Amino acid sequence: MHRYFERVNRISYEGRQSNNPLAFRHYNPEEIILGKKMKDHLRFAVCYWHNFCWDGTDMFGSGAFERFWQKGGDALELAKLKADVAFEFFYKLNIPFYCFHDIDVAPEGCSLKEYIYNLGVMSDILADKQAETGVKLLWGTANCFTHPRYAAGASTNPDLNIFAYASAQVCQVMQMTKKLGGENYVLWGGREGYESLLNTDLRQEREQIGRFMQMVVDYKYKIGFQGTLLIEPKPQEPTKHQYDYDVATVYGFLKQFGLENEIKVNIEANHATLAGHSFQHEVATAIALGILGSIDANRGDAQLGWDTDQFPNSVEENSLVMYEILKAGGFTTGGLNFDAKVRRQSIDIDDLFYGHIGAIDTMALSLKSAVKILVDGKLDEYVAQRYSGWNSELGRDILEGKMTLDEVAHYAETLVQEPKHRSGQQELLENLINRYIYD
């Protein structure tokens, strides 16, 4: 293996007493928790795009980083160098998975033919890197939003030829994801929305994206891809309004096109913030609807209205997220991908490690707090008691469709006393959660 991060040894667990910034204090991959290794509960992944493709450019300034793998030269050779750097980073960070967009790992080229050739070359190289390091692919996806051709969307584009081009791109990346043993394939519609209703046919675009998703499902079975298909909700940015606004919106879309048993969701914390929801809300909603697939672990900024993609650092927030996931049985093919980037002023190579190490420890500590909540059982007991009336014969008959509205109304007329309002005890439960986290 090449050594581009020479001063960094493979990151290991040193415990809470460690002051080493290049060590885990809470993440012990082999620690057994509820009968499963910590690494198997969390299933961490590093993203290719923020760490190895972004050069520090923002809306108001040019690239602030001087990454040696981003210097000028032959695009395909630079992609090979970037793969060397990325896999050394994955290996030294000691995480099991990574994620990519197609053009993160292979140059797009000047034609579809050149794009397909470059993907083929890089898929062989990535396969070799995976075998060498033991790092696996959590998910792959096609970038159908950056190129100017996708300014008006990919599957929702009014130009049929652009729809076709996006279809070709997705076909190639699904094949590549299968070849590399990817456990999921993600569909994120960054441009699947509108800027103005004045030039938009909402019904037409909805039919287009619905048919596109149906074809993606068909193609999954055609090529024998065994992974999970995921949609990543986001309300806006880069478009004014995206059709995959939040988890509930995505579920309604899936139901409309008969896809609710075929596609799940990849939930990003910062996207929940932009939609006006808590991270826990989106995760809990997906679980309630049976469509939780995977997580993009990051954080936004409540004072800012855009996707800041910061590393997660709140144990308080993520303990409740991990509690929801544990209560639902944990991940199957999904995991925790750090869709996060260092700040533009964090220009040192080591900053990439610091950001991920802090995020990994945050999620590990959150897992431990979530286990306390689950094992103690007091929160579950309270919720069960609060809804206990629905376990009665009457409650079951209502939910099973055995009673009509007027029959329930007649039951209400037989009540001797008015129903009593009961305390929700939110403050007590908040205190209880704080004890699990901070005691």
Curated annotation (Swiss-Prot):
S-S bridge residues: none
InterPro entries, per database record: Xyl_isomerase-like_sf, Xylose_isom_bac, Xylose_isomerase
Note on cofactor: Binds 2 magnesium ions per subunit.
Location within or outside the cell: Cytoplasm
Active site, per annotation: H101, D104
Primary localization: cytoplasm
The protein's enzyme class: isomerase
Keyword list, A-Z: Carbohydrate metabolism, Cytoplasm, Isomerase, Magnesium, Metal-binding, Xylose metabolism
Reactions that this protein is recorded to catalyse: alpha-D-xylose = alpha-D-xylulofuranose
GO CC list: cytoplasm
GO BP term, pick one: D-xylose metabolic process
Residues holding Mg(2+) 2: E268, H271, D307, D309
The EC number(s) this enzyme carries: 5.3.1.5
Binding site for Mg(2+) 1: E232, E268, D296, D339
Entry protein name: Xylose isomerase
TM helices/strands, residue ranges: none
